[in-house]
């Protein structure tokens, strides 16, 4: 195995650490800022407040990377689509159903994303130079599912029925979102992000044929476009829940880093790390348990991934009820772990 130059730098031989949703509700300092803003989208566009909460986990835990505080649904919102977040419910969107809806999307974009790029610039200015800054977007497929369902966390029968019955319109919508995603990610890089992540939260709901069309192909297009402008920018992909199709994804998508969910065996991570940097994959629920369990699980991952191309992370976002002291303990376990 050839060790790949780590996209997130450290001066020692310990794996870099950052956590998905590391700026979030488990932190009291985050909640204090959140209470000052009326709604979640307003929070995402508030340059000072979004910068502050992006930096909070860096100041508290010393993570090796910051990820911009934002949301994957700022993209459809910036296309003029109706998006709202309801407390204890989650995202609610106007449901995409027709060619008329597609025409509306094409004609009603706004400049809301400029605030996101201002946030990236401000964070980069205030972040330690040694700390990486991750910009991100949702994958075209995952963003599509929210628009087709009108909300999150469904069984996705509406989305799947739509792409089976409306192949041409589904392809048009996918391509449109793909192009807008490319522009959004490139603008984040221009603003100071030095790593990009593509979150495909609902990749795992598709059969193989549709997985190739709606997950693999648009992701390849995004990466090719970004690399055309910024060949040295590392790109993290996350086809969450893809199971056996992770391997097909890795065969076809020229990703720099593959984020792994908790259901993928560690031995698979170890094998894949011979060709690509892997990131993951501690079950977020582990951080709700005790220090003995946390330490055992972390040490198991570290022992298997020793001397591999590896970034430590969770297999999904940190849970709101996570005790911050358990996150502190996680960082301590990784930093103090002695490799054999």
Curated annotation (Swiss-Prot):
It is an enzyme of class 4 (lyase). Belongs to the uroporphyrinogen decarboxylase family. Homodimer. GO terms for cellular component: cytosol. GO terms for biological process: protoporphyrinogen IX biosynthetic process. Pathway: Porphyrin-containing compound metabolism; protoporphyrin-IX biosynthesis; coproporphyrinogen-III from 5-aminolevulinate: step 4/4. Substrate binds at residues 21-25, 40, 71, 146, 201, 316. InterPro entries: UROD/MetE-like_sf, Uroporphyrinogen_deCO2ase_HemE, Uroporphyrinogen_deCOase. This is Uroporphyrinogen decarboxylase. It comes from the Bacteria.
């Amino acid at each position: 195995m050839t060790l790949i130059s780590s996209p997130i730098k450290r001066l020692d031989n310990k794996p870099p650490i950052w956590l998905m949703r590391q700026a979030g509700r488990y932190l009291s300092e985050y909640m204090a800022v959140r209470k000052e803003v009326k709604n979640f989208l307003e929070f995402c566009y508030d340059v000072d407040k979004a910068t502050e909460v992006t930096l909070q986990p860096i100041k508290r835990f010393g993570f090796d990377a910051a990820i911009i505080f934002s949301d994957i649904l700022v993209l459809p919102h910036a296309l003029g689509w109706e998006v709202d977040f309801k407390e204890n419910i989650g995202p609610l969107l106007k449901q995409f159903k027709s060619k008329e809806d597609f025409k509306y999307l094409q004609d009603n974009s706004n400049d809301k994303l400029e605030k996101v790029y201002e946030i990236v610039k401000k964070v980069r200015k205030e972040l330690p130079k040694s700390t990486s800054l991750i910009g991100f977007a949702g994958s075209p497929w995952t963003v599509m599912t929210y628009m087709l369902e009108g909300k999150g966390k469904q069984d996705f029968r509406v989305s799947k029925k739509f792409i089976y019955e409306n192949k041409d319109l589904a392809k048009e919508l996918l391509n449109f979102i793909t192009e807008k995603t490319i522009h959004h990610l490139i603008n984040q890089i221009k603003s100071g992000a030095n790593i990009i992540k593509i979150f495909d939260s609902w990749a795992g709901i598709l059969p193989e044929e549709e997985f190739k069309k709606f997950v693999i192909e648009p992701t390849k297009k995004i990466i090719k476009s970004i690399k055309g402008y910024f060949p040295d920018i590392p790109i993290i992909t996350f086809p969450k829940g893809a199971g056996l199709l992770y391997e097909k994804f890795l065969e076809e998508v020229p990703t720099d880093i593959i984020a792994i969910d908790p259901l993928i065996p560690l031995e698979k991570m170890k094998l894949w790390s011979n060709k690509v940097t892997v990131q993951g994959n501690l079950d977020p629920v582990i951080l709700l348990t005790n220090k003995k369990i946390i330490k055992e699980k972390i040490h198991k991952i570290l022992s298997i991934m020793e001397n591999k191309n590896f970034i430590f992370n969770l297999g999904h976002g940190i849970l709101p009820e996570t005790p911050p002291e358990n996150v502190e303990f996680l960082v301590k376990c990784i930093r103090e772990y002695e490799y054999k």
